[in-house]
């Protein structure tokens, strides 16, 4: 009886541990983010593609596929701003229509625009 209790408690612990680790997993690629547009930040110091058009309420996902760190910063410095280390993603939802130019604050000339209808 005691051995059965220990085995049962062990299985419960393993199940909880497995569930808790999977529930803390985050998307590690834009493909699994559900975003309407995916943009790559590259070691060539460009966003590719540099423009995207979405509908308000949709999201854009930026992924750093290179080895250099980047940022994704709206030109007004208030709409969105995130660091983008190598291998990471940043997802932003655009609630309103408009044109949203952005840049990497680390690399001059690394720019793009999101158009939201």
Regions found by a protein language model. Name each.
Residues 14, 19-117:
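Extracytoplasmic copper-binding redox domains, predominantly the cupredoxin/blue-copper superfamily
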Residues 1-18:
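Sec-dependent bacterial lipoprotein signal peptides
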């Amino acid at each position: 009886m005691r051995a059965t209790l220990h085995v049962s408690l062990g299985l419960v612990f393993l199940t909880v541990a497995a569930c808790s680790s999977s529930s803390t997993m985050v998307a590690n690629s834009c493909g699994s983010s559900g975003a309407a547009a995916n943009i790559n930040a590259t070691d060539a110091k460009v966003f590719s593609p540099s423009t995207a058009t979405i509908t308000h309420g949709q999201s854009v996902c930026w992924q750093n596929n290179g080895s250099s760190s980047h940022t994704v910063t709206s030109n007004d410095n208030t709409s969105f701003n995130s660091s983008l280390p190598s291998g990471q993603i940043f997802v932003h939802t655009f609630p309103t229509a408009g044109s949203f130019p952005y840049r990497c604050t680390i690399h001059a000339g690394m720019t793009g625009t999101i158009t939201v209808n």
